[in-house]
Design a protein with these regions (language model features):
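Extended serine/threonine-enriched, polar tracts that run as long, contiguous segments within proteins
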Residues: 219, 225-243
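Signature of extracytoplasmic/envelope-associated structural regions
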Residues: 2-19, 23, 32, 50, ...
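Short helix/loop capping segments that flank catalytic or ligand/cofactor-binding pockets
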Residues: 68-71, 110, 189-192, 199, ...
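Protruding loop/beta-arch "assembly-hinge" segments enriched in small, turn-prone residues
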Residues: 1-39, 224-226, 240, 247-307
Length: 307
């Protein structure tokens, strides 16, 4: 059921004006685009692919590795068949959206606040869904580090990074950039480990914080995207916790996952005379998937909140 807004829902702000319904869509779209990025940090961590008009899917070929050999003078070089395609990934897109009904009375009274709120809610809702769709891919990585009930630590990140950068499979080491997308509570435990502190709300700072790298990391905590082992640590609040308060983040190359976008976001309105109002619809069309499995590592760890 769509969200319904009327004059009984919000206080009037501003005076009546002409061209109300035309203005509604313009204001809404601006607000929706403005609010989609903060709600979906993982979108910029994966490969974004545009599905061109007239196409219903995209095909992504993944090329394998070619081997060079030492040569002998006067001896012909054996040809290498190529380029070798190690895998082909196809991706389609589907619609995702939300609708809100705004009554005539609210619109006629020039309540621009109602429209702005609708835009904010729509943008955050679509962005949150897109983010959750990408996060849902983390569980698909075959390689996993950590365990339920145990906190991730500095060594967890080091192991993940070293695996991605030294893998010698068909696809080769994971290409840069590599990012870590983790639950806020997983990140807090990393900082606690770096600082040499006890994982407690009352005892942080009870032990001296080592100078150097540990001190810098603690000072810059929550500044955002400070790297560990050259990998930016991204806070992803949309990562959910299971019934045991464990969360699954990931360390992965941008090229490990992809997001195919047909229509990123659009807002439209439709007059409903019998309901005496206007329906505002915001829709995004996308599909997401895994490109190369060994270029990502799932990070499982305790994410319970301290009380």
């Amino acid at each position: 059921m769509p969200l319904s807004l009327s004059t009984n829902t919000l206080t009037k702000n501003g005076s009546a004006g002409s061209g109300t319904f035309q203005d509604v869509s313009n204001i809404l779209l601006a607000e929706a685009i403005d609010n989609i990025e903060p709600a979906a940090p993982n979108k910029e961590l994966v490969t974004n692919i545009t599905i061109p008009s007239g196409h219903y899917q995209v095909t992504v070929p993944i090329y394998g590795r070619t081997t060079a050999v030492a040569l002998s003078e006067g001896v012909d070089i054996s040809p290498v068949q190529g380029p070798e395609i190690a895998n082909v990934v196809t991706q389609t897109a589907s619609e995702h959206g939300v609708m809100t009904f705004i009554s005539d009375r609210l619109a006629y009274q020039g309540n621009d606040d109602a429209v702005a709120i609708v835009g904010e809610q729509h943008g955050r809702a679509v962005g949150r869904l897109l983010d959750q769709d990408i996060i849902g891919l983390f569980d698909g990585f075959s390689n996993s580090i950590g365990s339920a009930g145990a906190a991730l630590n500095l060594n967890s990140i080091a192991v993940a990074v070293s695996f991605l950068r030294s893998d010698d499979s068909t696809y080769g080491p994971a290409p840069n950039p590599i990012n870590a997308s983790l639950h806020p509570e997983q990140i807090r435990r990393l900082i606690t480990d770096v600082a040499g502190q006890t994982n407690s709300i009352t005892t942080f700072g009870g032990e001296p914080i080592p100078t150097g790298l540990s001190e810098d990391i603690v000072k810059n905590y929550m500044r955002g995207r400070d790297p560990l082992f050259g990998v930016p640590i991204i806070e992803s609040p949309n990562i959910s916790r299971d019934g045991s308060d464990d969360a699954k983040g990931a360390v992965f190359s941008t090229r490990a996952l992809h997001l195919a976008i047909e229509n990123e976001i659009r807002a439209e309105e439709e007059r409903d005379a019998s309901l005496r109002g206007t329906e505002i619809v915001t829709v995004g069309v996308w599909g997401q998937g895994e490109t190369v499995d060994v270029w990502g590592v799932e990070m499982l760890g305790d994410a319970v909140s301290l009380s």
